């Protein structure tokens, strides 16, 4: 139980906050076309050397992790140069599992890192033919009128917990040249509903079409 003394101790705790990464506000990697994105992410951010020690855990907050391109190609490599013990990436949005995220250039599911992580886990656990069966069911489902379409793609995600997919995303984002431990933490759908009880739409998180391509 929390008493006055323990509450005071909790409230007196202050995490150290530094401007470790500096971003050029004029450059936007999310809305850049696929051909130029990888090159652009190399130039968007810079870091403040000496802001953390090698024994520090570094926590960074992102509004969402969609493709994971900027994290993998730029941010993690850049922050790793500061030699933190661990980098924790906190996403205020849940895992984005389906296309048309925010309506911006998201027509291909394989662009989504959550989907790619689920596919990797699925291939480790099941036969390749099982994934092919789901694909065929999706193609068949797409012949129906929109009001009759069922979400077959969930069969790829259902065998795994959110945490298992998050751990796989963490492994995918950590390249061999990253020496720090990397952990990715996502907001949950349940807690998002608590934070935003009257949302306009969560379709890119929970209610997709069945297209795999």
Q: Where in the sequence are the language-model features?
A:
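Extended, hydrophobic alpha-helical segments in both membrane/secreted and soluble proteins
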Residues: 57-78
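Short, glycine/charge-rich flexible loops or terminal/linker lids adjacent to PRPP-binding catalytic cores
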Residues: 1-57, 69, 97-110
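Extended, composition-driven regions rather than compact fold-specific motifs
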Residues: 138, 156-163, 176-177, 193-198
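Conserved small/polar residues in nucleotide/adenosyl-binding loops
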Residues: 203-209
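A conserved beta-strand->alpha-helix junction
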Residues: 9-29, 126-145, 184-190
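Acidic, Ser/Thr-rich peripheral helices and adjacent loops at domain boundaries
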Residues: 101-126
